Amino acid sequence: MTLAALAAAVDAAADAPLDGALDHIRPFLADIGWFQAWMTQQTSCMRADPLHLPPVRASRHGAGRHLVFARTERIWVIATIIDPPARAAERLHFSGRHALCRPLNRAVEGELFGIEGDRAVRRGPIHAPVGSVLELDERREALRLTPGAGPLMMLRALVAPPGPVLSRLIDIASGQVRALAQADEGHARTLMLLSLLRLQGRTDAATCFDAALDAPLPAQRWAVMREYLALDTGAALVPLADMARADPDAQVRALAGQTLARLEPEPCPA
């Protein structure tokens, strides 16, 4: 197992169904000789040169710090250090991906939750010792870490099914969904393009905005509409009225209706 072999496995998994993609990536969590060799090499380089920077991307999000060994639209392979929370989390993140987690310095301790209908329910405790590989289907499962047990180091792989990835943030006390997001890089690129067209005043590109209004998630449709209104308010009024009347999401209908009421001219009192 080498980093080059990992890169080849990620490439091979790119167009595979979820089970096939997992079959390509799972061996690199079962045998982490490649990771240990990389750590040994980089430690030697830093001893020889205190200014040496490892040739991988580093990132931080919340309590997690990450070294990124592979990242594509579908597959991430990362080494992570998580600072434990002072108290148990009140919300759960269902990432929409399949997670493979190998603890490196201590056991993973926590509580497993699953989705039944639209609610999160407790499934029981989790104990994954060092050297084991914990697998979670984070489309329907989420782990709440036990607070206060010291930093946790893990090697992780996150593998998405083909197509857009839907993540959910669910309140533990009520079990209800608090937020939905679609990790859809195609839509993100589309929205960036629409923003550029708007900044350039490209009113001749209105058909691009019309086409993007059929995005699958409510927040995506509303984001497109805001760009459309900023580009050409007059041209956007008809699709805005359609959205206020017929959008599948009640909140989007309400936002569109409120916006339409502010934009439509007042009738002449004469």
Task: Please annotate each region the language model reported.
Residues M1-W76:
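A short, N-terminal "cap"/entry segment at the start of jelly-roll beta-barrel domains
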Residues V77-S95, H127-P129, D137-R139:
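Conserved short histidine dyad/triad with adjacent acidic residue
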Residues F94-G110, G114:
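Short, conserved beta-strand element in jelly-roll/cupin
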Residues A99-C101, G148-S167:
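A short hydrophobic beta-strand segment most commonly corresponding to one strand
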Residues A99-R102, I115-T146:
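Short acidic-glycine-tyrosine-enriched beta hairpin
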Residues I172-R178, R202-L213, T233-R245, P267-A270:
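Amphipathic alpha-helical scaffolding segments comprising HEAT/armadillo-like alpha-solenoid repeats
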Residues G186-H187, L217-W222, G234, D249-Q251:
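Alpha-helix N-cap/helix-start positions at coil->helix boundaries
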Residues L191-Q200, W222-L231, A254-E264:
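Structural detector for internal amphipathic alpha-helices that build alpha-solenoid repeat scaffolds
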